[in-house]
């Protein structure tokens, strides 16, 4: 007998359950399952492999085995336990037959088996015919195919083999459903093969390998009858059996035929879904392959539409073709043919054969329509890979497959192929898509690569040869190993920080370790299966476990998404820190130059060009390996983005048809750029460029004009240069048809020199593309250099020349060389180059005196043409010099202050680069060069003359250190000279002296008032100091330190021994000096400034009356005293305790300094929001500060504690830029999508409620006839811009009801589909508050109504279509809208016009002019907010009459009729209102805040105590730049948006006492420092502690004949950034607070009086509008009043002086106030500061004062 041949173990592959085996019985060519069973589902593979691993029983192990029944697995492999039957039910050959049936003529050796006890066992009946095999045992059961090469034993050995060998044969499962018949047939065929009946199975041509015997046919019939009950057979099988009940062979033949057909279709679908193309194969072959697949599928009934096909193709594009995925997917009607046109075009560009396939070239219009951009700013996408594939690459270089340098994937819209709204379908099995099923977008397997990582797990990767991890927390024995080279799947280098050990502690208490590499530049933590295999650990994906070879289970495997993962809990943590890991390459010899530094050094060229140039040695001094390229792929230079912004790139190869090949320097392109306006006369206004066609060498020459002689001089120079330097003669010069080229003078010159002029033809810009693109490139570089360096614009040509020098030295990927190499010149030595605008110090060899400084600050421009020196710009001398005597000025801060390049400080790199060039400061330099007098060869820049009429930004004069500057400060500043960060000025003023010519980081002028007269006991003193002097660095540091102390209580207090003058050091933007100024009262300041400006600040005489009220106008009908008392009587002003007489201290004694920082936003202002403070000033001292806010910041800081992670790239956020960038608060989404509310909602009860709401909404839509149900439209027939996307949104209302709404995606609606002039109006909050206040005073009934589905009552005029709701199942159809669906741009306006028309025509209402959505008639007032209506009426029947009329047309629900005389509770537009008619009204939001604030994840009551105030005075927001990584920054900004969004909503509803804090913190949403977050937490904490507070209104006295409308105003001078003031106003109607406003002044005020005028002028327009509204709603007379605590402001308003004001802006405001007072019956009165409740709107107050000003109107 032939010996058994057992296969060896194959390597364990990713996803395989065990080793694959091969027996001699398996046929390689004739097996009919080659096209079917070989692609069965994974469960079938697993069961087959598990079956092949079973061992023989001990009784039969010693018996020779039958070669046809060979067990291919060694006995050491345990049998699987996860089959459909228990282990004891596994059948031998005898067990596979019914009881009593003899096998091969031998009696059954097992009369009873557990299998026969199965409930699915079909016992044989008496009529059953069991096969009795012939007695000739030599007849084999199956005949091998000729190709198999198998031989069989003779008859004598066959009998012994059959009786001695028992092979376990797994029976097929029972058929339980007709739909499962295809899968069951496959298992049944496997059963026949394992039973040695493979030869009788029909092949692909429908014929078996051998003839079936009668016994075998009987066996076939009986087993088929047992395992396939007739009730579960499909119809076509029953049809066959009805003709011949024994024709099992025909059933098998038909089944195999269907398998073959399905397999081909499935293979095509899988191939189509996994297309990959990167240009490595011809585009024709790729197109043929794709079109053949699509044609086959279409012919077989599987329709692939154009959009799906294009999406599948685009998903597989990579390399240069990848951009098509982000540009072409937006074209809805794109075809496959159009997509392949783009692919062919790119392929031709790659191959350089632009004329090979002209039929694929697109015209220019196609290019424009495509909006194609070659600039790929997105980051590489992570490739979705089947984790079960094995990487067979044997490259010596370690490869980490599927590793990306970023977690961000390209973002696409809803139609993109990278997203899907349905569950992904894996197209890895042929039965995933059945015959006739259409392949739609939802069928394609999409993966969101930004969300596919399983946190806390390692990804198992069979393709990675090394293990990589991002966190250093688990790395043991870390060490530097720079020799390791790791690349990802795209062959990009991955920088490795360190190598170490990864130690595992598995669940069986065993420990092991493998090598691991540390890098933060990967998307996942990768665990290599190859390295696990090296330590005897394999992955079994059948059991989903990690196990040893002996079967010991170590850890479970989790399948998440497309990948398999292992938990990190089995990793042992190490004690190594992140800085330790990341500092392993800190040695000077191994540290590489950062790419951003090289990028700036080489004129901001792109990374591929720089890298190629270094590789080809066109740039010398260092190699490609000396540069850190890790950030080159994702690096975005802000200066390049600004300076080189463009639409799209040019068309490559567009000029080939216009010229032939020429030798170097024979064919030149030239063009002129200019003019550049607003430049000094000495600076050039034009430049002319020349480019050689062959070498691409460039020349640029400056021009002051475009005269003929100027152009001729340049042509003469360039021709002579080429002839003498390159021994070449120019033959052709290509140029445009400008007059400077077509003039007779130049034409004769060219003709004389034998040069052919080549002019462009009309409308043929492509022919002149070389010169024009060069000019554009140089101008891009110029803008970028000027932007980066900050140099003035008149140095623009120096930037052009610097760019030309660098670009001549960079290699072209096309020509493989640089222009200098083509010209035969040496490469550029980068060590001789400085970044453009690099600050340097130039030696002055001939100073004015011996004690004069020898160094002159300057800025490096470019290497000199005429010497070995460098062209340097000296601002103090206003000229450029050519010198070698300079030293690089170093600074620890980035010079690029406009953009923060992740802390780009290149001083050390620059020192290493220029180490071989010693400066004049070196001690070994004994001779001084006198070449400072050598003027630059650029005469146009030697002596800069500025136009006197040109406007300039004049810098503030530097103050001498002797002016009240402490000596220590000056000394410290002097020591920092070498580290000063000097930046060039944008413009140079000819009047600026040398002492102040150097630029500052921020160019802002400080408001100054000179010659301020100060009155003292000794007489008049004149001070020539700025009003706001800059603070010294030392004082700034002390102030910062003081503001950050743990005790936030202000420690400064006044004593009787201190004077009323304070030296206030105030930080000035960019300033380095400080001054001390006396603190002067408002009245004194205004009184002294009046000598220069007679009318702006005139102070009135002191009024020492008890009320301190100055009436401005006295009406004839009311006495002055009565009007004053009438206005103030009902106001909720605080009751002040009696004060003792004030003892004024000696004016010459100094008050303690108030530490402040002028440039910072603060919650405490400057000296409590005043630059000048005296005892008799309106600003209070801080001695009554009883601040109790002592919440430890440590409590807040524990919120965002992060685990040890590798450092990420930091993002610097500048305070002022962040504050200026805040336009509005981003709304936070509070609704749920369909998948969140229903599909994936795990809360069953809530899900059912949402489903109910969903059906209710659909029924309402149908009831309202929202769309046309008579006709459905094909999507291809409708203009895409008229198709509106739609979606369902769900939310839970405050009353607990669940609501669904079908809305349109108006945010992406095309502008042509709506009228932008239409307005969607809602009632203003002030109108609602006014109506509520009048309702209380007049005993009105308040009725609240709701109109269901209000928008759907409004018809839509435009032709718009939407996709049907999901439940209709018509994805390819469209329906036309008839009603205004929620979400459309025009829906709100349509509804407003509809309801407005109905209320006016049917209800007899009229809209109040100027107040939209406020309607009235003689009895009823209506406030309308979309579908909510609030009705106010003296007679409840009048309200009921309106309701009856509304119900005739609309589905109107009465929320609250308001008929009770007891307290009634309302919920009106978010306000929780308690109203008892004729008594009081309380407005609050307690229930809403109780629900919402805990959801903000803010730690509430960390100390178990309540806060008494929302903020505290004396605390300033630090202006230091914020360094934070990108993810954390976005997270904190999002958190700030949520917190400030809620606070703003509450503040503007009724908590007007919080508006100052809300407004200040809202300006810092984009600056989420720890300090800002702490202050925001305190604000939310205070809101939580006072959530039960209410705005209290009481009914006005019935005897009052008039309505009194009052605005109380206040301003805090200069307490905001850039000296802006905070202004605030509170509005009261009949003593009830109805609104408030706190904001930063739009203009910069120079005095407290100007700030107060600004505040009052801001309140007057709203005051007049409210007055008109009140008169329309209530016919009582109205008295308007303005209250302010500024006497000087009242004096200005009262004055009739017509002289000019000092400031025309505030003069205009003051004159307007005069007109308002004189013409609109407006009364202006003085109010004491301690009673001014508007004070809470402009500054933080001590707790005692805060409570005193607010407790009467909100409590």
Curated annotation (Swiss-Prot):
Biased composition (Low complexity): 153-165, 402-418, 960-969
PROSITE patterns: ASP_PROTEASE (PS00141), INTEGRASE (PS50994)
Region called Disordered, residue ranges: 1-93, 126-174, 352-421, 956-1087, 1092-1111, 1130-1187
Site (Cleavage): 401-402, 582-583, 1217-1218
Biological process per Gene Ontology, one example term: viral translational frameshifting
Active site positions, chain numbering: 461 (for protease activity)
Gene Ontology, cellular component aspect: cytoplasm; nucleus
Subcellular location: Cytoplasm; Nucleus
EC code(s) of this entry: 3.4.23.-, 2.7.7.49, 2.7.7.7, 3.1.26.4
Catalytic activity: DNA(n) + a 2'-deoxyribonucleoside 5'-triphosphate = DNA(n+1) + diphosphate; Endonucleolytic cleavage to 5'-phosphomonoester
Motif Bipartite nuclear localization signal: chain residues: 1178-1212
Database matches in Pfam families: rve (PF00665), RVT_2 (PF07727), TYA (PF01021)
Disulphide bond pairs: none
PTM annotation (Phosphoserine): residues: 416
UniProtKB keywords: Aspartyl protease, ATP-binding, Cytoplasm, DNA integration, DNA recombination, DNA-binding, DNA-directed DNA polymerase, Endonuclease, Hydrolase, Magnesium, Metal-binding, Multifunctional enzyme, Nuclease, Nucleotide-binding, Nucleotidyltransferase, Nucleus, Phosphoprotein, Protease, RNA-binding, RNA-directed DNA polymerase, Transferase, Transposable element, Transposition, Viral release from host cell, Virion maturation, Zinc, Zinc-finger
Residues engaged in binding Mg(2+) 1: 671, 736
PTM field: Initially, virus-like particles (VLPs) are composed of the structural unprocessed proteins Gag and Gag-Pol, and also contain the host initiator methionine tRNA (tRNA(i)-Met) which serves as a primer for minus-strand DNA synthesis, and a dimer of genomic Ty RNA. Processing of the polyproteins occurs within the particle and proceeds by an ordered pathway, called maturation. First, the protease (PR) is released by autocatalytic cleavage of the Gag-Pol polyprotein yielding capsid protein p45 and a Pol-p154 precursor protein.
RNase H Ty1/copia-type domain segment(s): 1610-1752
Function summary: Capsid protein (CA) is the structural component of the virus-like particle (VLP), forming the shell that encapsulates the retrotransposons dimeric RNA genome. The particles are assembled from trimer-clustered units and there are holes in the capsid shells that allow for the diffusion of macromolecules. CA also has nucleocapsid-like chaperone activity, promoting primer tRNA(i)-Met annealing to the multipartite primer-binding site (PBS), dimerization of Ty1 RNA and initiation of reverse transcription.
UniProt domain comment: The C-terminal RNA-binding region of CA is sufficient for all its nucleocapsid-like chaperone activities.
Subunit structure: The capsid protein forms a homotrimer, from which the VLPs are assembled. The protease is a homodimer, whose active site consists of two apposed aspartic acid residues.
Miscellaneous field: Retrotransposons are mobile genetic entities that are able to replicate via an RNA intermediate and a reverse transcription step. In contrast to retroviruses, retrotransposons are non-infectious, lack an envelope and remain intracellular. Ty1 retrotransposons belong to the copia elements (pseudoviridae).
Name under which the protein is recorded: Transposon Ty1-LR2 Gag-Pol polyprotein
Source organism of the structure: Saccharomyces cerevisiae (strain ATCC 204508 / S288c) (Baker's yeast)
């Amino acid at each position: 007998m032939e010996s058994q041949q057992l296969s060896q173990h194959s390597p364990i592959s990713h996803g395989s359950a065990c080793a694959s085996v091969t027996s001699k019985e398996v046929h390689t060519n004739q097996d009919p399952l080659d096209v079917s069973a070989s692609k069965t589902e994974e469960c079938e593979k697993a069961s087959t492999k598990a079956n092949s691993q079973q061992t023989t029983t001990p009784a039969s192990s010693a018996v020779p085995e039958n070669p046809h029944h060979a067990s291919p697995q060694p006995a050491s492999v345990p049998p699987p336990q996860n089959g459909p039957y228990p282990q004891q039910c596994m059948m031998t050959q005898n067990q596979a037959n019914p009881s009593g049936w003899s096998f091969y003529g031998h009696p059954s050796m097992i009369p009873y088996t557990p299998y026969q006890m199965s409930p699915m066992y079909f016992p044989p009946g008496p009529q059953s015919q069991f096969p009795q095999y012939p007695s000739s045992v030599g007849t084999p059961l199956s005949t091998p195919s000729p190709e198999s090469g198998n031989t069989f034993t003779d008859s004598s050995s066959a009998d012994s083999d059959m009786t001695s060998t028992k092979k376990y044969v797994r029976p097929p499962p029972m058929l339980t459903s007709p739909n499962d018949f295809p899968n069951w047939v496959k298992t049944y065929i496997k059963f026949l093969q394992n039973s040695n009946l493979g030869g009788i199975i029909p092949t692909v041509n429908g014929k078996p390998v051998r003839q079936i015997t009668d016994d075998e046919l009987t066996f076939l019939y009986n087993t088929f009858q047992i395992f396939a009950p007739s009730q579960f057979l499909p119809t076509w099988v029953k049809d066959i059996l009805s003709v011949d009940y024994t024709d099992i062979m025909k059933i098998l033949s038909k089944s195999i035929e269907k398998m073959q057909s399905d397999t081909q279709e499935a293979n095509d679908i899988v191939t189509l879904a996994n297309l990959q193309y990167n240009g490595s194969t011809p585009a024709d072959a790729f197109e043929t392959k794709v079109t053949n697949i699509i044609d086959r599928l279409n012919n077989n009934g599987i329709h692939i539409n154009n959009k799906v096909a294009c999406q599948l193709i685009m998903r597989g594009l990579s390399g240069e073709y990848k951009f098509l995925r982000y540009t072409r997917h937006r074209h809805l009607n794109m075809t496959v043919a159009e997509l392949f046109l783009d692919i062919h075009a790119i392929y031709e560009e790659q191959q350089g054969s632009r004329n090979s396939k002209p039929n694929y070239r697109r015209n220019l219009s196609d290019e424009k329509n495509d909006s194609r951009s070659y600039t790929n700013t997105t980051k590489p996408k992570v490739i979705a890979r089947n984790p079960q594939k094995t990487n067979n690459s044997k490259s010596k270089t370690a490869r980490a497959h599927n590793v990306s340098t970023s977690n961000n994937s390209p973002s696409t819209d809803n139609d993109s192929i990278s997203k899907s709204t349905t569950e992904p379908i894996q197209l890895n099995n042929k039965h995933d898509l059945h015959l006739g099923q259409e392949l739609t977008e939802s069928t394609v397997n999409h993966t969101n690569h930004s969300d596919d990582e399983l946190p806390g797990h390692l990804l198992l990767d069979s393709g990675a040869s090394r293990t990589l991890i991002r966190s250093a927390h688990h790395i043991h024995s870390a060490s530097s190993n720079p020799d390791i080279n790791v690349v990802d799947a795209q062959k990009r280098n991955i920088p490795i920080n360190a190598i170490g050990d990864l130690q595992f502690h598995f669940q069986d208490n065993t420990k092991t370790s493998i090598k691991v590499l540390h890098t933060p530049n990967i998307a996942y933590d990768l665990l290599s299966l190859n390295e696990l295999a090296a330590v005897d650990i394999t992955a079994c994906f059948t059991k989903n476990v990690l196990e040893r070879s002996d079967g010991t289970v170590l850890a479970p495997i989790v399948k998440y998404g497309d990948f398999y993962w292992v938990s990190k809990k089995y990793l042992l943590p190490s004690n190594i820190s992140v800085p330790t890991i990341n500092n392993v390459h800190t040695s000077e010899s191994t540290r590489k130059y950062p790419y951003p530094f090289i990028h700036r050094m080489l004129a901001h060229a792109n990374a591929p060009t720089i890298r190629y140039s270094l590789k080809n040695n066109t740039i010398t001094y260092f190699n490609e390996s000396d540069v850190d390229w890790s950030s080159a792929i994702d690096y975005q230079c802000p200066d390049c983005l600004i300076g080189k912004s463009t639409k799209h790139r040019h068309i490559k190869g567009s000029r080939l048809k216009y010229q032939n090949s020429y030798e170097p320097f024979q064919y030149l392109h030239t063009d002129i750029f200019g003019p550049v306006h607003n430049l000094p006369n000495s600076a050039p206004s034009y430049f002319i460029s020349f480019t050689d066609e062959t070498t691409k060498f460039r020349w640029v020459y400056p021009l002051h004009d475009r005269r003929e002689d100027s152009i001729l001089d340049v042509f003469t120079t360039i021709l002579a240069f080429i002839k003498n330097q390159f021994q070449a003669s120019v033959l052709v010069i290509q140029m445009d048809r400008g007059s400077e080229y077509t003039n007779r003078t130049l034409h004769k010159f060219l003709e004389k020199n034998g040069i052919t002029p080549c002019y462009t033809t009309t409308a043929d810009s492509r022919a002149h593309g070389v010169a024009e693109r060069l000019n554009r490139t140089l101008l891009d570089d110029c803008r970028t250099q000027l932007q980066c360096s900050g140099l003035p614009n008149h140095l623009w040509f120096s930037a052009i020349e610097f760019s030309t020098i660098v670009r001549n030295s960079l290699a072209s990927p096309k020509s493989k060389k640089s222009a200098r190499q083509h010209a035969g010149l040496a490469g550029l030595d980068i060590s001789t180059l400085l970044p453009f605008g690099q600050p340097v110090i130039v030696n002055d060899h001939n100073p004015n005196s011996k004690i004069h400084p020898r160094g002159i600050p300057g800025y490096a421009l470019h290497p000199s043409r005429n010497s070995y020196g460098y062209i340097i710009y000296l601002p103090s001398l206003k000229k450029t010099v050519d010198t070698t005597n300079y030293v690089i000025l170093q600074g620890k801060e980035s010079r690029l202050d406009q953009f923060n390049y992740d802390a780009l400080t290149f001083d050390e790199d620059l020192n290493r680069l220029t180490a071989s060039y010693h400066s004049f400061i070196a001690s070994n330099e004994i001779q001084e060069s006198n070449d400072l007098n050598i003027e630059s060869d650029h005469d146009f820049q030697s002596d800069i003359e500025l136009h006197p009429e040109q406007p300039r930004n004049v810098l503030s004069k530097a103050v001498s250190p002797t002016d009240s500057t402490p000596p220590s400060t000056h000394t410290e500043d002097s020591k920092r000279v070498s580290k000063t960060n000097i930046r060039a000025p944008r413009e140079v003023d000819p009047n600026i002296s040398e002492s102040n010519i150097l630029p500052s980081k921020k160019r802002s002028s400080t408001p100054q008032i000179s010659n301020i007269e100060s009155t003292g006991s000794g007489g008049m003193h004149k001070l020539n100091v700025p009003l706001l002097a800059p603070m010294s660095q030392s004082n700034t540091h002390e102030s910062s330190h003081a503001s950050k102390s743990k005790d936030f209580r202000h420690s400064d207090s006044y004593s009787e021994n201190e004077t009323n003058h304070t030296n206030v050091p105030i930080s000035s933007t960019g300033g380095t000096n400080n001054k001390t100024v006396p603190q002067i009262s408002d009245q004194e300041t205004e009184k002294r400034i009046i000598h220069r400006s007679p009318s702006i600040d005139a102070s009135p005489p002191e009024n020492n009356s008890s009320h301190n009220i100055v009436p401005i106008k006295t009406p004839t009908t009311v006495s002055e005293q009565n009007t004053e008392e009438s206005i103030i009587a009902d106001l909720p002003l605080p009751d002040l305790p009696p004060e003792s007489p004030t003892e004024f201290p000696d004016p010459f004694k100094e008050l303690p300094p108030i530490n402040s920082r002028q440039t910072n936003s603060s919650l405490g202002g400057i000296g409590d929001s005043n630059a000048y403070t005296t005892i008799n000033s309106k600003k209070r001292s801080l001695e009554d500060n009883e601040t109790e806010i002592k919440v430890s910041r440590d409590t807040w800081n524990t919120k965002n504690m992060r685990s040890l992670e590798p450092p990420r790239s930091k993002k610097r956020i500048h305070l002022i830029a962040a504050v200026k960038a805040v336009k509005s608060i981003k709304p936070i989404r509070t609704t749920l999508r369909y998948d969140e509310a229903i599909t994936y909602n795990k809360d069953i009860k809530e899900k059912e409620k949402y489903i109910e709401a969903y059906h209710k909404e659909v029924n309402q839509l149908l009831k309202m006839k929202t769309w046309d149900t008579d006709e459905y439209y094909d999507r291809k027939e409708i203009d895409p811009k008229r198709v509106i996307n739609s979606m369902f949104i769900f939310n839970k209302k405050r009353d607990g009801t669940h609501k669904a709404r079908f809305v349109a995606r108006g945010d992406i609606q095309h502008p042509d589909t709506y009228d932008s002039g239409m307005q969607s109006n809602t009632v203003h909050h002030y109108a609602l508050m006014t109506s509520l206040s009048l309702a209380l005073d007049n005993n009105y009934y308040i009725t609240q109504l709701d109109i269901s589905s209000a928008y759907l009552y409004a018809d839509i005029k435009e032709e718009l279509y939407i996709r049907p709701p999901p439940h209709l199942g018509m994805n390819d159809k469209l329906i036309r809208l008839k009603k205004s669906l929620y979400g459309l741009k025009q829906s709100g306006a349509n509804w407003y016009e509809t309801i407005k028309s109905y209320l006016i025509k049917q209800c007899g209402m009229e809209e109040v002019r100027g107040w939209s959505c406020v309607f009235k008639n003689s009895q009823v007032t209506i406030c309308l907010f979309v579908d909510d209506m609030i009705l106010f009426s003296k007679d409840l029947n009048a309200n009921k009459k309106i309701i009856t009329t509304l119900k005739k047309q609309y589905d109107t629900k009465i929320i609250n009729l308001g008929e009770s005389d007891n307290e009634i509770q309302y919920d009106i537009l978010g306000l929780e209102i308690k109203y008892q008619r004729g008594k009081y009204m309380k407005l609050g939001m307690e229930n809403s805040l109780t629900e919402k604030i805990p959801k903000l994840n803010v730690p509430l009551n960390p100390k178990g105590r309540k806060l008494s105030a929302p903020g505290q005075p004396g605390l300033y927001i630090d202006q230091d730049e914020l360094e934070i990584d990108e993810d954390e920054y976005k997270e904190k900004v999002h958190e700030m948006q949520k917190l400030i969004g809620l606070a703003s909503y509450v503040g503007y509803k009724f908590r007007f006492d919080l508006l100052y804090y809300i407004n200040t913190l809202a300006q810092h949403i984009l600056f989420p420092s720890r300090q800002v977050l702490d202050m925001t937490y305190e604000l939310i904490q205070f809101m939580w502690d006072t959530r039960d507070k209410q705005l209290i209104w009481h009914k006005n006295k019935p005897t009052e004949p008039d309505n009194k409308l009052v605005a109380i105003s206040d301003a805090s001078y200069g307490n905001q950034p850039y000296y802006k003031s905070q202004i605030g106003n509170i509005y009261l109607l009949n003593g009830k607070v109805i609104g408030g406003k706190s904001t930063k002044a739009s203009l910069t005020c120079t005095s407290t009086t100007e700030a107060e005028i600004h505040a009052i002028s801001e309140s007057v327009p709203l005051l007049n509008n409210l007055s008109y509204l009140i008169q329309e709603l209530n016919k009582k007379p109205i008295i308007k009043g303005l209250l302010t605590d500024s006497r000087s402001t009242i004096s200005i308003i009262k004055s009739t002086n017509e002289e000019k004001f000092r400031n025309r802006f505030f003069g205009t405001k003051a004159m307007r106030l005069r007109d308002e007072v004189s013409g609109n019956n407006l009364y202006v009165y003085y109010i004491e500061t301690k009673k001014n409740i508007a004070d809470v709107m402009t500054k933080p107050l001590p707790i005692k004062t805060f409570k005193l000003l607010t407790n009467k109107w909100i409590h």
